[in-house]
């Protein structure tokens, strides 16, 4: 963990999966809004690069190596950060595109662990702090949690389960003044597909070839907007897609 000690009393935004893509873009935008940002992910070198960019722009950033599938990592984060105003559950991912018949259970377990149990672990650990500040939990889901597609069963199942978790949580903590929002993006041009295809750059590039995808900043804009509404305003969920994916349409490629 590295940090820059702050006595400014700034609000604190915790972002998981903050080493690249949507997480990194979200952290930078929260910093620009005056938050001290807490960056968590597995790739500490990349986290440091994001943090240095934030600090160079006059912001405050703290870095923790956090694997959301590790109870120890998550508990350590919660102990180190007693104040949390915003939690962005962004860590997640897909692995493979096998059919149901060809399903690889190891991949299904990993997707459930990182997308569902990862969100559970971090949210559960930070809820006491969020209740103290009447904060907000924002979870980056996916249109895969609302629409299914061939080859996506493992990821679809995980994201549907994550959505159920979020919807129950919203009901359970409303009386504590904690807002709960889900942001469900469609196709975003990040490292998502590179991870899904085990680093196969050709397969990953084909996902984005010939279509205009959302950018990480597009999604970060929406996350920060939802988080900065008045405390009386709860946005249950927002679904955002590139124009070729509206209404569940297949990309025009």
Annotate each predicted stretch with a short phrase:
Residues 33-48:
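Conserved glycine-rich Rossmann-like NAD(P)H-binding loop of the short-chain dehydrogenase/reductase
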Residues 98-100, 107-109:
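Substrate-binding pocket helix/loop in short-chain dehydrogenase/reductase
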Residues 123, 158:
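Active-site helix of classical SDR
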Residues 142:
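Residue(s) in the substrate-gating loop at a strand-loop-helix junction
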Residues 182-186, 201-249:
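C-terminal helical subdomain
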């Amino acid at each position: 963990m590295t940090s820059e000690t702050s006595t400014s009393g700034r609000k604190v935004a915790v972002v998981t999966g903050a080493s690249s893509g949507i997480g990194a873009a979200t952290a930078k935008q929260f910093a620009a809004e005056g938050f001290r940002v807490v960056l968590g992910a597995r790739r500490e070198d990349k986290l440091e690069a994001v943090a240095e960019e934030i600090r160079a722009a006059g912001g405050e950033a703290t870095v923790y190596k956090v694997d959301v599938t590790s109870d120890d990592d998550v508990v350590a984060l919660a102990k180190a950060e007693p104040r949390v105003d915003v939690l962005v559950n962004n860590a997640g991912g897909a692995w493979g595109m096998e059919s149901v018949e060809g399903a690889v259970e190891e991949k299904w377990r990993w997707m459930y662990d990182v997308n569902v149990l990862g969100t559970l672990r971090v949210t559960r650990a930070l809820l006491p702090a969020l209740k103290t500040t009447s904060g907000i939990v924002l979870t980056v889901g996916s249109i895969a949690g609302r629409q299914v597609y061939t080859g996506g069963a493992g990821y679809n199942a995980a994201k549907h389960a994550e959505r159920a978790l979020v919807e129950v949580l919203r009901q359970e903590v409303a009386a504590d003044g904690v807002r709960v929002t889900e942001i469900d993006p469609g196709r975003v041009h990040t490292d998502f597909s590179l991870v899904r295809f085990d680093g196969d750059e050709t397969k990953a590039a084909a996902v984005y070839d010939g279509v205009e995808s959302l950018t990480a900043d597009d999604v970060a804009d929406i996350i920060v907007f939802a988080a900065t509404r008045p405390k009386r305003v709860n946005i249950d969920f927002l679904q955002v897609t590139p124009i070729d994916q509206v209404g569940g349409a297949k990309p025009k490629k």
